[in-house]
């Protein structure tokens, strides 16, 4: 009877342990630290969609080929709420508790900068698809490049140059006003860089106005801008704020063209802004209208799965997944250090957003940009800008 009881107990334990075995135990675990809620949830949704599309397809083909053989990839997705402190906490949890070999995201610079600090200190590869602020890949103390942090996009100094030249040369603007969120890392950096670049190239900044995240009344700032009579208004702010600013500006009789940064790239800006944002221009990473054959396949696959074409965040995330996969293959191991070393040796990568070129010791790709116009309820390609 005792033997039977012991046998039953051991059998029960074995079944229990088997049932609790982690199905991803032998997989390559990649974390996602993204903005699924908060101020910019469309950004997180696009990033999640693209990563799942990429790795589901890779897994269907057998997974990533390492030295020990093929391995499936398991995504560990976490929401950072679009907040810097949560992004840092998620980074800590993904790396320390989930043992991910790499982390995709955060996307917003405000979240990517502190998360990058955690990734660097814990020696885990992080790639931000969409963070353009230079601080993301720089050590805060030494101002030297972080060894474990990379990005999938161009940086703000390049973007500022592109926008300033476009405003001066293509739009014929001589006077510009700037309105930006002073409490958010990316808009703050973009506003300052645009001001400096625009004036250095012969333009005049006639108003430099600020607001704080969550503000809904921009009448005081816009009244000052109206009095300054600019040719253009530069709004380096996220897609969720632009429609309200544009609406209030038009009601005040302001007719100047709006020019924006890559933070405008979600189609939500068209849904929310309507006629008030029609005719506006912004800098971006990707256009479905000038796609390569590889990009056309991505656009078709993404649209078929999600019912809408990909935005730039989706395309940049897809390319970030591709960079990680290429580095995993080259490194041959399911290890952070092998991945980092292989990723740091990539000098050129052709993705759906174009060609990436990396200088030795830098996690910032040298890439081209596009200028898009919001016209007739859609994003229309205007021109390319080369680095």
Tell where the protein language model's regions lie, with residue ranges:
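Short, low-complexity disordered leader/linker segments with a strong preference
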Residues: 1-29, 386-387
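Beta-alpha junction/loop-to-helix N-cap segments that form part of ligand/metal-binding clefts
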Residues: 21-23, 27, 42-47, 61-139, ...
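Extracytoplasmic "Venus flytrap"
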Residues: 31-52, 78-84, 107-110, 179-188, ...
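Short, polar/charged alpha-helical segment
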Residues: 43-66, 192-199
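Surface-exposed patches in mature extracellular/periplasmic domains of secreted proteins
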Residues: 63-68, 73, 105, 178-181, ...
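Extracytoplasmic ligand/sensor domains, especially the bilobed periplasmic-binding protein
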Residues: 99-207, 257-281
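Extracellular/periplasmic periplasmic-binding protein-like sensory domains
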Residues: 246-318, 378-386
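Segments of small-molecule ligand-sensing domains
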Residues: 304-314, 325-381
């Amino acid at each position: 009877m005792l033997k039977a009881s012991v046998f039953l107990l051991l059998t029960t334990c074995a079944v229990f342990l088997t049932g609790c075995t982690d199905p991803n135990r032998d997989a390559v675990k990649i974390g996602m630290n993204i903005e699924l809620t908060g101020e910019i949830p469309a950004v997180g949704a696009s990033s999640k969609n693209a990563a799942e599309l990429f790795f589901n397809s890779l897994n269907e083909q057998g997974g990533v080929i390492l030295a020990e053989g093929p391995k499936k990839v398991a995504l560990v997705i976490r929401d950072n709420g679009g907040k810097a402190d949560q992004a840092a906490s998620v980074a800590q949890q993904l790396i320390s508790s989930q043992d991910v070999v790499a982390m995709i995201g955060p996307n917003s610079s405000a979240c990517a900068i502190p998360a990058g600090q955690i990734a660097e200190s814990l020696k885990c590869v992080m790639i931000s698809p969409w963070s353009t602020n230079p601080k993301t890949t720089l050590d805060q103390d030494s101002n030297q490049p972080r060894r474990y942090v990379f990005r999938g996009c161009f940086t703000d100094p390049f973007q500022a140059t592109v926008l300033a030249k476009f405003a001066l040369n293509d739009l014929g603007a001589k006077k510009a006003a700037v309105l930006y969120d002073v409490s958010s890392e990316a808009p703050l950096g973009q506003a300052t860089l645009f001001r400096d670049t625009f004036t250095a190239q012969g333009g005049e900044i006639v108003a430099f106005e600020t607001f704080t995240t969550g503000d809904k009344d921009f009448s005081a700032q816009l009244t000052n801008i109206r009095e300054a009579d600019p040719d253009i208004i530069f709004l380096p702010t996220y897609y969720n704020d632009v429609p309200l600013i544009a609406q209030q500006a038009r009601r005040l009789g302001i007719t100047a063209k709006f020019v924006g940064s890559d933070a405008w790239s979600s189609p939500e800006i068209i849904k929310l802004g309507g006629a008030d944002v029609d005719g506006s221009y912004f800098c971006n990473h990707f256009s479905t209208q000038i796609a390569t054959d590889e990009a056309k396949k991505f656009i078709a696959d993404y649209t078929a799965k999600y019912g809408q074409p990909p935005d730039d965040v989706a395309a940049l995330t897809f390319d970030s997944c591709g960079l990680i996969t290429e580095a995993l293959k080259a490194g041959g191991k399911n290890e952070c250090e092998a991945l980092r070393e292989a990723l740091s040796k990539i000098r050129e990568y052709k993705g759906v957003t174009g060609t990436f070129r990396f200088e030795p010791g830098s996690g910032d790709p040298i890439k081209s940009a596009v200028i898009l116009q919001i016209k007739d309820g859609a994003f229309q390609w205007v021109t390319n800008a080369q680095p």
